[in-house]
Swiss-Prot record:
Residues noted as binding NADP(+) in the record, renumbered to the chain: R48
Known catalytic reactions: 5-O-(1-carboxyvinyl)-3-phosphoshikimate = chorismate + phosphate
PANTHER family: CHORISMATE SYNTHASE
The species this protein was found in: Acinetobacter baylyi (strain ATCC 33305 / BD413 / ADP1)
A single BP term in Gene Ontology: chorismate biosynthetic process
EC number: 4.2.3.5
Record-given protein name: Chorismate synthase
Cofactor entry: FMNH2
UniProt keyword annotations, A-Z: Amino-acid biosynthesis, Aromatic amino acid biosynthesis, FAD, Flavoprotein, FMN, Lyase, NADP
Amino acid sequence: MAGNSIGQLFRVTTCGESHGVGLMAIVDGVPPGLELCEEDLQKDLDRRKPGTSKFATQRKEPDQVKIISGVFEGKTTGTSIGLYIENTDQKSKDYGNIAQTFRPGHADYTYTQKYGFRDYRGGGRSSARETAMRVAAGAIAKKYLAEKFGLVVRGHVIQIGNEVAEKLDWNEVSQNPFFCGDVDAVPRFEALVTSLREQGTSCGAKLEILAEQVPVGWGEPVFDRLDADIAHAMMSINAVKGVEIGDGFAVAGQFGHETRDELSTQGFLANHAGGILGGISSGQTIRVAIALKPTASITTSGKTINLDREDTDVLTKGRHDPCVGVRATPIAEAMLAIVLMDHFLRHRAQNADVVMPFEPIAP
């Protein structure tokens, strides 16, 4: 299983399963001298961790991260940073009924066919439990980028099911369990998710993630364009089925004179491209949106097959999110930060001596 790392110079490698002993990450490429402690990572982990509201899974994990290497006397040493989170609230008995069957819409069938064997407890490696380490690693990137450039990565929920947020107040995002910036949409989100849980079903979601104060010039055409790597990172998140950069799929119905992001000496006149032109950051705000599918872990019985290749029915047990998008915001923020940190280091490595012909225009 070779797909456990992301990034080239800022490289994050994770391991661990939903019901294993714990989760681990190795973070390579962190420059030396960054002041770093566990609390710096814990803030984002607390935003992601399960069991914090009635609208998410009731599995209760403290997700207390431990830094086991790469930091000395409160500063990064430039060597690999090792991170560890213990699993404490596994209930593997809830999954005994799927040891011989495949949950429809899950990775059970494909993991079994690929590896010939699978850890069925909570989905094993395919569970979103592994994203805790992404958030921890992403918090390191966010801290460095903020201190170096004033760069801010933040996200919010746009849509849950058929309910859509109509406005954005960043002060509201941290005040509700949905990471929603529309105070009027929160009661509608609450009612919908409560109803879904009662019905034994689930719904999808759409999130927006922004990166502000990104310097111009990051991205490595042609195959490692910044937007290509962002899309790759976002699609690696569990349940993500669509990624948009800038205006995204809406451009199919737009016209060239509307979307070409004209320039002036005073700055850009629009940002339909989402802060990336030709695969390189323009200095404008990077705008990313992701769509997450409804989780297939629902309490309604579904048709499937078993290991004997026989038709059967399966009922999913365990503790699950009625909408996985509720806790996905800090995960998506982390993935965007990881990509940006990697591209900063790559840009510096190749282009540190490049002299721009003029100062960048305003975003």
